[in-house]
Design a protein with these regions (language model features):
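Cytosolic-side transmembrane helix boundary signature
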Residues: 55-58, 212-236
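Transmembrane-helix signature of membrane-embedded glycosylation machinery that interfaces
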Residues: 8-11, 82, 217, 221
Length: 385
């Protein structure tokens, strides 16, 4: 995401003034971006190509422009090759691998929980609307409104002005920002790319989206430039909004990552969509047991599924020996496991087909924006803390 932002910025600078220095800066950014993710190459080509097209439309394509274009293209390629030694051993094989892996992520045959449906990525693909729905569900409403408004305004300008829309830095920036998130998103929808954990694999779209939102805000500001009171009210509303969102992040720390926008019903959300994909709640659950379990007694813990098991064991493995020694881990099917504290990651319990605990079984819950990401519960015969 960060390198996408840098590539977008450098393409704006290169288009504004196509010098050798700016071409080299763009080449470095594009090379690093492509090395990080192969989709970064597509973003870099898109940004560079649009900057080139804009220069042609403005009839600013002189000899020095040609030199800058060659430096940018060859420099980006050279930077990518130097950063990617595997490419030198077998260029065709390596490029085939990264392109295939970008289209169909093969290093992780996991599962998705989407709209109450469990999707096994080892043999299924997400529906084409998976990414836009996840973006809509997890993007704050005001930011989403600004993105959609800016996208609509920019598209209208494109239809009206055709290639002339690429004239001028402000208009070009609006079109470039829109293109950098809309075109990749449409491509991923068409290919139904195999991704997991919401739209984490598509976070490179986030900065161009925010750039579109910022452009929309600037359009609103220009409309209100001569209206003192509305301008102040708008600035105050924006500040209040950011304060509310920041407060929400602080209050839900360290589980703020499980955010869903306010229009998403919290009733049964745990069984419809993923929350704690990375077992962050396990750490909080273990710390709660350490603090609240009877002193001087071993803390027996078990789990509901293999992914939660991995989270429990991985967390305990990182603890100092003295703290870790209090915990005794047990398999859920063993005799001792029947009296152990049971740690349950809600997302992984649903993916494994395990029922969520009844209210009278719950000792502790870790919540994010009103939804439970993790429980500690025990059978009736277990020792209560």
């Amino acid at each position: 995401m960060d390198l996408t932002a840098v590539v977008l910025w450098q393409s704006l600078r290169l288009r504004e003034k196509p010098t050798m220095g700016r071409a080299l800066c763009f080449a470095l950014a594009a090379g690093f971006c492509t090395n990080t993710r192969i989709i970064g190459g597509a973003v870099s080509v898109l940004c560079g190509g649009m900057a080139l097209l804009s220069l042609i439309v403005e009839k600013r394509f002189f000899r020095r422009t040609w030199r800058a274009v060659l430096v940018a293209a060859l420099g980006a390629l050279g930077c990518y090759v130097l950063l990617t030694p595997a490419l030198l051993r077998d260029p065709a094989g390596y490029l085939t691998y990264v392109l295939r892996n970008s289209y169909s992520f093969s290093r992780w045959n996991g599962t998705l929980l989407f709209c109450g449906r469990v999707i096994d990525l080892s043999w299924q693909r997400p529906p084409f609307y998976y990414l836009p729905v996840m973006i809509a569900l997890t993007m704050p409403l005001v930011q989403m409104g600004l993105i959609l408004a800016g996208g609509a305004l920019t598209l209208r300008r494109c239809f009206r002005q055709k290639l002339e829309v690429l004239r001028g830095q402000e208009s070009f920036a609006a079109v470039l920002s829109l293109s950098c998130w809309l075109l990749p998103l449409l491509g991923m929808m068409a290919m139904r790319v195999r991704v997991y954990n919401g739209w984490r694999h598509a976070y490179f779209l986030f900065f161009p989206m925010m750039a579109t939102a910022g452009w929309t805000l600037n359009r609103i500001r220009l409309r209100l430039v001569a209206k003192k009171l509305p301008r102040r009210l708008g600035a105050g509303a924006l500040a209040a909004l950011l304060a509310v969102q920041g407060t929400g992040l602080a209050l839900n720390h360290p589980f703020q990552f499980a955010y869903y926008q306010p229009l998403v019903s919290r009733d049964g959300l745990e069984q419809r969509h993923e929350l704690d994909y990375w077992n962050v709640g396990i750490q909080a659950a273990l710390e709660w047991l350490e603090e609240n379990a009877p002193a001087g007694q071993p803390i027996r813990v078990t789990w509901t599924d293999r992914r939660t098991r991995s989270g429990v064991l991985s967390n305990l493995a990182l603890w100092p020996g003295e703290r870790r020694a209090r915990f005794v881990t047990m398999e859920p099917d063993s005799e001792e496991g029947a009296s152990a504290y049971r740690i349950l990651n809600t997302s992984y319990a649903v993916l494994a087909g395990e029922p969520l605990p009844a209210e009278n079984e719950i000792l502790y819950r870790a919540e994010s924006y009103g939804s439970a990401v993790c429980f500690i519960c025990v059978p009736k015969e277990a020792v209560q803390p």
